[in-house]
Regions:
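Intrinsically disordered, low-complexity regions enriched for glutamine and histidine
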Residues: 2, 22-24, 95
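Bacterial N-terminal signal peptides that target proteins for export
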Residues: 2-13
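Alpha-helical and His/Cys-centered functional microenvironments
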Residues: 8, 19, 101
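Bacterial N-terminal signal peptides
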Residues: 11-24
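Mature catalytic domains of secreted/periplasmic carbohydrate-active enzymes
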Residues: 26-546
């Protein structure tokens, strides 16, 4: 029988152990922003050292393969790149932002960072809903990310019905959680959370539907993404989670949209090689037709490895397929001609001679799923697609599924409505090339990144033009209520070719038309064949391109 004294000693010991654990937790989560970057980086390197050999092997493979194909890791060689015809023909793709950030479903896909920004809406919401960031950090959402209703086959079927020709899921976002079966990390969807190779399943399902498959990597941004968490008591400061949270350096950024030469954020050679190895791993495992990168690949410390990756990927794509791959880049990260420029949430004011792409989200607020979201209309998406295609570009439209793997009904309906329009009018979009002018009409497009919602409503006088062989397509962006349309660019007095025939896609009506000095006058039927926009197939007495 134990004495009261023995019990008191035991209780005291338990109390001391508990206090020690609390003190350790407080110390481990204490702010570390004042530590020097090299020390912080060494902590990440040590935490992820179990994969050093695998990383080094992939980097070595990249450097060897850079000497085994037509491309070399320098800009002069990379600028001989030519965009594959399939990509120019495709016009419309689906982007997917899906990850652990879909669990809190608050703010936007930058929740993993903003939840640590003291005073932000995400910071306040996180404390109210889950507790303080040193007790419940971003990592603690991972077990809640179950994806129990995720069906890659159902997604792929929907994307095909939407009229998309390629699909690009985010393989790893800024948060550092890989959505694929990586051999370079324990923090992956294949090993935690859903315990499924999401990217592998999507690759198989998308290709089974006859669509092209790509991946998006935002691994490089993880270098700084969670650095703000070092300014408050948080789990990011705890070295036992460094393999997931990464270096988490302080972001010393220059203004967005300009060259990153003056971005002084600390980037170690180890991180640059980790980024290169992760990219090479995605190429080797999934043979993507497209690799999409966000803006930070232009950071000065990354650029030497960027040319290595580009040469490796282009050479590899020629080995495993019948065409060279496509790299999407932003701003000034890559040299002109070496890849495909991407404008985030933006459009151009005129035809660009080099092929380009816009990526935007069907959501008005976020790239990932959030509660109480609002969405773009089918008309908005279709009009944007038409305008971009007329200017020699593609549209990559993003969706954000819920954490359980379901796609909101509102999003599905937008995609299906776009697909229904393309089913009738696709000849005016797929496989087309720009005409001598992109279009006409009074409505001016708000050009540049992050302006895609600034364009005012189109009028019946607004048209966009595309060509295919000797056919011109004139796409009207609003149906005239009086049934009469005039295409000024086809006036005889401004060099318009003699028009032979005009057909309204989706209609059996025989159109009456008259080519006059002020334009091509058309009498349209009482009812438009489709909502949102209509397409006219125009042929000429002589070859269009003579």
């Amino acid at each position: 029988m134990l004495s009261h004294r023995s019990l008191s000693i035991r209780n005291l010991g338990a109390t001391l152990i508990a206090l020690s654990a609390i003190l350790h937790a407080q110390t481990a989560s204490a702010p570390t922003a004042s530590q020097d970057p090299e020390s912080i980086d060494r902590t990440w390197q040590k935490a992820s050292s179990k994969y050093d050999e695998a990383r080094a092997s992939l980097v070595k493979q990249v450097e060897a393969d850079d000497l085994q194909g037509p491309f070399r890791p320098d800009w002069e060689s990379l600028q001989r790149y030519e965009v594959p015809e399939w990509y120019k023909d495709a016009k419309f793709g689906i982007f997917i932002h899906w990850g652990v950030y879909s669990v809190p479903a608050f703010g936007n896909e930058w929740y993993p960072r903003n939840m640590y920004v003291e005073g932000s809406p995400e910071y306040k919401h996180h404390i109210a809903a889950y507790g303080h960031q040193d007790k419940f950090g971003y990592k603690d959402f991972i077990p809640m990310f179950e994806a129990e209703h995720f069906s890659a086959a159902a997604w792929a079927e929907l994307f095909k019905k939407a009229g998309a020709k390629y699909v690009v899921p985010v393989a790893e976002h800024h948060d550092g959680f890989a959505m694929y079966d990586s051999g370079l990390s324990d923090w992956t969807a294949a090993k935690m959370g859903p315990r499924r190779d999401v990217i592998g399943e999507l690759a198989k399902a998308v290709r089974a539907e006859g669509l092209r498959f790509g991946v998006s990597s935002h691994r490089v941004e993880h270098d700084f993404f969670l650095g703000v968490a070092r300014t408050i008591p948080s789990d990011v400061n705890d070295s036992q989670y460094a393999a997931f949270y990464g270096p988490a350096h302080t972001w010393l950024a220059n203004p967005s949209g300009v060259p990153l030469n003056d971005d002084f954020t600390y980037v170690s050679s180890a991180w640059a090689d980790d980024w290169l190895a992760r990219g090479a791993e995605l190429v080797e495992k999934y043979h993507p037709d497209i690799v999409y990168f966000d803006w930070w690949i232009g950071q000065a410390s990354i650029r030497p490895n960027l040319t290595k990756f580009a040469a490796f990927y282009y050479n590899s794509s020629l080995k495993y397929g019948d065409h060279v791959g496509v790299i999407n880049y932003k701003d000034y990260a890559m040299q002109a001609h070496s890849a495909v420029l991407d404008l985030e949430r933006g459009q151009l004011g005129d035809i660009r001679s080099l092929y380009w792409q816009t990526d935007t989200s069907v959501s008005n607020k976020s790239w990932g799923y959030i509660k109480d979201d609002t969405f773009k209309s089918p008309e908005f998406v279709i009009h944007q697609l038409i305008d971009i295609v007329s200017k020699n570009g593609n549209l990559l439209m993003n969706i954000g599924p819920r954490s359980d793997g379901t796609i909101p009904d509102e999003v599905q309906q937008v995609l299906l409505d776009v697909g229904a329009w393309l089913n009738v009018n696709g000849d005016a979009i797929y496989g087309t090339r720009p005409w001598r002018v992109f279009g006409e009409g009074p409505t001016k497009v708000a050009a540049g990144s992050f302006h895609d919602t600034d364009t005012t409503r189109y009028t019946p006088e607004d048209f966009r033009f595309t060509t295919k062989a000797d056919v011109l397509y004139a796409i009207g962006l609003d149906w005239p209520t009086n049934g009469e349309a005039v295409i000024r660019s086809l006036a005889q007095t401004v060099g318009g070719e003699p028009v032979k025939s005009v057909v309204l896609l989706g209609s059996d009506a025989k159109l009456q038309f008259d080519q006059r000095a002020d334009g091509l006058h058309l009498r349209l039927p009482a009812q438009a064949p489709t909502k949102y926009a209509y397409a006219l197939r125009v042929t000429f007495d002589r070859a269009l391109h003579e």
